[in-house]
Amino acid sequence: MSKQYYVYILASRRNGTLYIGVTNNLVRRVWQHREGLIDGFTKRYDVEKLVHFECFDDVRQAIHREKRLKKWKREWKINLIQQSNVAWDDLYDQLDII
């Protein structure tokens, strides 16, 4: 079984502050953000709602995608989220299926 890597987007609320990250354990990483265990941007701006994620088999591809998304215009990021999550639902509770 190959290792999985995830690029994820957290939001403070619908159309709110966005944070993009990469991890090899999405459940643990989002939980850390939600519990305030990671000092910095997400804790400071209360960004803890998982609104989008993508899965990769190759860590280099995941990191490349994260860097590309971080350079995107805000409008493009919002459109990406809304393509798969129109209501901006928190996807964290659905993570037990991955």
Residue ranges of each PLM-predicted region?
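GIY-YIG nuclease catalytic motif and its immediate N-terminal context
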Residues: 1-38, 43-53, 60-67, 84-86, ...
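An amphipathic, aromatic/His-enriched active-site/gating alpha helix that lines ligand/cofactor pockets
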Residues: 64-82
